């Protein structure tokens, strides 16, 4: 099997960079409209081919590199090194698995799983969205469809994709699915595989989108809850005392001007609020399951600004003050930048220390990690075996995978500002930040000129 030398690989990438630099310097004022479109078409071909060039690199990393070498999972390593989202990293890994060359257990090269699709991408005839449609088709196609038919379907879809937009390909793929698998996937196993609920990122106004697929059991459960709590007049936030337990009377129904969607929202809020208040969820990482919010004394007194939850959500002060009347949530206040000085000699952090770390760090302190406080563990910056103390000023938050990195060559330390610095082993050090500012965007935007690292 052919293998290029390091010098040949570096020279090829240098030539690629130089060629692209030449293209970037082109002045196209003399071109006509048809010529401009033709140039864009040629650039699109090369954009698509670049994706194919990445597959071998990603698959080789997946096969030879362990988490210790990568500094985490392959998904995390790609996201941090390439400055892409973890979701985009996962997409590239999945695409490489489907379209990149594989190796047998004996080391022999194997063709791509989606052979025709891979060939079309290498020629620049199809792009990312075409590939996404073809991958989605095979994700839904029943395993009962034999290999020969699957290969023929893949070849047909790849050929159709070369002359169509991705949105047009979708309709053809849907028709082909109807022919090959008219009854659909209705087994318990398929439903279990497809189930899921996703809560999107908070938008600028604090609102979040929710989407997903519900199993019949969850749908039936939600229907029963909504029948009670989303009925007209129930759980109406405009009422001085919203009705939850009792049946709304005619006057309560008449006052209710909410849409059904708004009543559904308020019903979910009432149900989950009641569950939190019940105390029946036990503990999570050493604290009762509840809402932990951090804010400053100044903002609380002014009733302006936003608090930040242990999950990383921003909560307007008006909501925060109202929430305080419904359950025993934790509110951590800062009258300055430093946390309270809390000490004890046990290795496990106390609940009070965890609350302060939720408020101070807001999430995993390793640079590049977006895990919120709810999904993080308490980490001793200086190993407990050295100090035998659990001092709030020597603690930080780290998610499970990052916490374990300390056993694999990573080191942590506190700087003069009280921030936790993560020092990678030499083979992973490419000049990346030492401090995680992801959970503190205000510090990035309003950082003072005090030589504070960021």
From Swiss-Prot:
Belongs to the Rv1128c/1148c/1588c/1702c/1945/3466 family. One of its GO terms (molecular function) is endonuclease activity. Residues 364-405 form the HNH domain. Transmembrane segments: none annotated. SMART domains: HNHc. This is Uncharacterized protein Mb1179c. Pfam families: DUF222 (PF02720), HNH (PF01844).
């Amino acid at each position: 099997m052919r293998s290029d030398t390091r010098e040949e690989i570096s020279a090829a990438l240098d030539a690629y960079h130089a060629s692209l630099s030449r293209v970037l310097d082109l002045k196209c004022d003399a071109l006509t409209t048809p010529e401009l479109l033709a140039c864009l078409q040629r650039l699109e071909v090369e954009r698509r081919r670049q994706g194919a060039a990445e597959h071998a690199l990603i698959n080789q990393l997946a096969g030879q590199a362990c988490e210790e070498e990568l500094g985490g999972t392959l998904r995390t390593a790609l996201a941090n090194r390439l400055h892409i989202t973890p979701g985009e990293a996962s997409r590239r890994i999945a695409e490489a698995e489907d379209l990149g060359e594989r190796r047998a257990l004996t080391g022999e090269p194997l063709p791509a799983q989606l052979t025709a699709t891979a060939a079309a991408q290498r020629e620049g005839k199809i792009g990312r969205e075409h590939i996404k449609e073809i991958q989605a088709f095979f994700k839904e196609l029943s395993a009962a469809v034999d290999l020969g038919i699957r290969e023929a379907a893949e070849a047909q879809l790849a050929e159709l994709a070369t002359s169509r937009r991705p949105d047009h390909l979708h309709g053809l793929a849907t028709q082909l699915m109807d022919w090959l698998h008219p009854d659909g996937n209705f087994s318990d196993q398929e439903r279990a595989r497809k189930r899921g609920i996703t809560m999107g990122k908070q938008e600028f106004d604090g609102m979040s989108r929710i989407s997903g697929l519900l199993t019949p059991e969850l749908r039936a459960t939600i229907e029963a809850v909504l029948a009670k709590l989303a009925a007209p007049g129930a759980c109406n936030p405009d009422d001085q005392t919203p009705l939850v337990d009792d049946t709304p009377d005619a006057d309560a129904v008449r006052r209710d001007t909410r849409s059904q969607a708004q009543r559904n929202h308020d019903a979910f809020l009432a149900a989950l609020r009641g569950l939190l208040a019940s105390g029946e969820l036990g503990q999570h990482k050493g604290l009762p399951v509840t809402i932990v919010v951090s804010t400053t004394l100044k903002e609380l007194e002014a009733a302006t600004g936003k608090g930040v939850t242990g999950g990383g959500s921003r909560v307007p002060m008006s909501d925060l003050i109202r929430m305080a009347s419904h359950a025993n949530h934790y509110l951590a206040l800062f009258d300055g930048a430093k946390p309270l000085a809390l000490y004890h000699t046990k290795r496990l952090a106390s609940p009070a220390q965890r609350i302060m770390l939720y408020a101070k760090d807001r999430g995993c302190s390793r640079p590049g990690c977006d895990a919120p406080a709810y999904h993080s563990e308490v980490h001793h910056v200086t190993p407990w075996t050295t100090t035998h103390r659990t001092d709030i000023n020597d603690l930080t938050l780290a998610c499970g995978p990052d916490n374990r990195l300390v056993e694999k060559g990573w080191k942590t330390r506190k700087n003069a500002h009280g921030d936790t610095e993560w020092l990678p082993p030499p083979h992973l050090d490419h000049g990346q930040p030492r401090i995680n500012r992801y959970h503190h965007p205000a510090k990035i935007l309003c950082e003072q000129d005090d030589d504070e690292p960021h």
